[in-house]
A protein has these predicted regions:
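Residue-level detection of the helix-turn-helix DNA-binding "recognition helix"
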Residues: 13, 27, 38, 66
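Short, basic-rich loop-to-helix N-cap that marks the start of a DNA-contacting helix
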Residues: 39-52
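Residues in the helix-turn-helix
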Residues: 21, 32, 60
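Short, charged recognition helix plus adjacent turn
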Residues: 2, 10-11, 62-74
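Short basic helix-loop element that most often maps to the first helix and adjoining turn
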Residues: 6-25
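Recognition helix of helix-turn-helix/homeodomain-like DNA-binding domains
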Residues: 28-42
C-alpha cells in the first residue's frame, strides 16, 4: 500500500507515548490501532480524533510512498 503510518510511530516515539496511550487519548478501539499497525485504512473520523489528541495534522501521521505496483491482466 502506498499510504502508511510511519510518521505516527515516529511521533509517538518522540513524545514517549505508546499505542495504548493514543487509544485512550483519542477514544479509539484496539481494532483501529491494529489496522494502523498493518497499514490498513482507517476512517476520517478516527484520523481526526488522533490529530486532535496529538495536536497535529494528517501529514504528521500519514505518509505516501509511491512504490505501489498495480497488477495488470495481460
Amino acid at each position: 500500500m502506498a499510504l502508511n503510518y510511519k510518521p505516527l510511530w515516529i511521533q509517538l516515539a518522540k513524545k514517549g507515548l505508546k499505542k495504548t496511550d493514543v487509544i485512550a487519548m483519542a477514544g479509539l478501539t484496539t481494532n483501529v490501532m491494529a489496522q494502523m499497525g498493518k497499514d490498513k485504512p482507517i476512517t476520517f473520523k478516527n484520523l481526526e480524533r488522533i490529530c486532535k489528541a496529538l495536536s497535529c495534522t494528517p501529514n504528521d501521521i500519514i505518509s505516501f510512498e509511491d512504490n505501489y505496483v498495480e497488477k495488470v491482466n495481460v
